[in-house]
């Protein structure tokens, strides 16, 4: 894991930067699947916007990034939305978001860590080494590609299990 410095409106951020591999997820965020007749983000985005997080301009799906051997834990997300009723197929869910950056082929893309809380998302097991990111469109990216992910250390704790 490396540290990179970025300037924000208030103070420099020392981003934690890790290498990861883009892998296939459940394939429900971006479009219809066996479990959902629609893309989940299509339903969720308007709710997130109404609650203060506008994802306009971001790709309508998630990048699933395998961070092994690292794991992550959200400790102070920028947004947490509780009891989001976006489907009648299961009970409301909680979601948290924290800013991040994805670097692919030396180009940096703004993004958000997208974290459906596992305690409210019982249908899908989420590996603690798998980071889901909603980013601006990244031309040419595909499964198996290596990326770097930068996360805010005050908001996301990254560790390497012993």
Predicted segment positions?
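Fold-independent oxyanion-binding glycine-rich loops
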Residues: 25, 116-117, 152
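Short, Lys/Arg- and Gly-enriched loop/turn segments at beta-strand edges
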Residues: 154-162
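Residue-level "contact hotspot" at macromolecular interaction interfaces
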Residues: 140-142
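Conserved "cap/hinge" positions at secondary-structure junctions
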Residues: 135, 151-153
């Amino acid at each position: 894991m490396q540290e990179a410095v970025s300037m924000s409106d208030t103070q420099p951020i020392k981003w934690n930067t890790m290498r990861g591999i883009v892998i296939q997820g459940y394939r429900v965020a971006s479009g219809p699947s066996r479990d959902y007749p629609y893309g989940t983000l299509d339903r969720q985005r308007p709710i997130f916007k109404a609650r203060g997080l506008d994802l306009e301009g971001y790709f309508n799906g998630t990048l699933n990034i395998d961070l092994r051997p690292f794991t992550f834990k959200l400790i102070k997300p920028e947004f947490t939305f509780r009891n989001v009723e976006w489907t009648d197929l299961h009970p409301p869910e909680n979601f948290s978001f924290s800013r991040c950056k994805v670097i692919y082929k030396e180009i940096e893309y703004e993004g958000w860590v997208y974290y459906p809380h596992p305690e409210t998302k019982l249908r899908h097991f989420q590996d603690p080494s798998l980071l889901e990111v909603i980013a601006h469109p990244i031309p040419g990216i595909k499964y198996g590609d290596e990326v770097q992910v930068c996360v805010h250390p005050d908001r996301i704790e990254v560790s390497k299990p012993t």
